[in-house]
Amino acid sequence: MAIEKELLDQLLAGRDPSEVFGKDGLLDDLKKALSERILNAELDDHLDVERLEGGPANRRNGSSKKTVLTGTSKMTLTIPRDRAGTFDPKLIARYQRRFPDFDDKIISMYARGMTVREIQGHLEELYGIDVSPDLISAVTDTVLEAVGEWQNRPLELCYPLVFFDAIRVKIRDEGFVRNKAVYVALAVLADGSKEILGLWIEQTEGAKFWLRVMNELKNRGCQDILIAVVDGLKGFPEAITAVFPQTIVQTCIVHLIRHSLEFVSYKDRRTVVPALRAIYRARDAEAGLKALEAFEEGYWGQKYPAIAQSWRRNWEHVVPFFAFPEGVRRIIYTTNAIEALNSKLRRAVRSRGHFPGDEAAMKLLYLVLNNAAEQWKRAPREWVEAKTQFAVIFGERFFN
């Protein structure tokens, strides 16, 4: 409902912007007046309901003062009371000291990568609110329950494509700051939309860790993954085939190219990349192997022998790529979504230095993912062609 212009003119008459929007200005006065009006209306309604229900006689019994935090200020409210003590306001509950928008503001700032100290300074500078670091941590800790629910939510029966990738995060563990891997699984559904299946902080290395992750996915309802795209994760192929025996494990071509370029001087990179293209764009596995051999024996292969060695080590999981038609290859090769996702996660953790523990890291990374969730839902342009080819290649498995 729009506020009448004449009423606004009366409220703003003779006031400059600082008197309206500043601390203890008109906006704060209005918020206080409206809140107290709502509280009194709530008590009237409460007393009317008790009378209609034939309860014991009850009536107003004065008021009490209560200081609460809102999203923009600290405010002292006059809270009406009833004689029987049965009134518990909905606007601001009896033992509540913060309006919900205050918590939402803190969580929003935290999700944007701001540290506890930065949030504290921001609230003090903009709103004149002095909030302790413990309170900010307590507010953000309320997210942990949502993290648990999200990490254990039911999954789809089948995912045509799942990218498994990792970022490195510094986390304090047993008195030492360790550089831990945080793994993320980004799935493409049958309609081309995307879903983040979960986040896992590395506790053990290799197949044992990945077996636990795969069993977790299965216990949450996932019965099949058609193609899993990974970046040389130790123990991953053995673990996924133990739980999802029909899954094709495919090395991420983009990561393999990047790894190859780590051996190459900067001035040579623009020439080496086209030379590698002949390998992964070959028509089939046999032609791809011949292209690899030609590269290995050629000028760049002789100058940078570690490149061909890297491709040969991963060749078993490069080969599946050649069996797919162009539409499916393009989807596997196009890693824009996972790259954008990792970029957001890295940007959020960059200013942190290190996290005090695994829970603190999970809390922030979950909030970053949750804020970006809408972006992952859109199907990529390439999916229209790829979907038809997935259906032909995988048949009934694709439609589960």
Swiss-Prot record:
PROSITE patterns per the UniProt record, alphabetical: TRANSPOSASE_MUTATOR
Keyword vocabulary terms for this entry: DNA recombination, DNA-binding, Plasmid, Transposable element, Transposition
Keyword DNA-binding in record: yes
A biological process term (GO) from this entry: DNA transposition
Signal peptide: none
Highest rank taxon of the organism: Bacteria
Function: Required for the transposition of the insertion element.
Name under which the protein is recorded: Transposase for insertion sequence element ISRM3
Organism, scientific name: Rhizobium meliloti (strain 1021) (Ensifer meliloti)
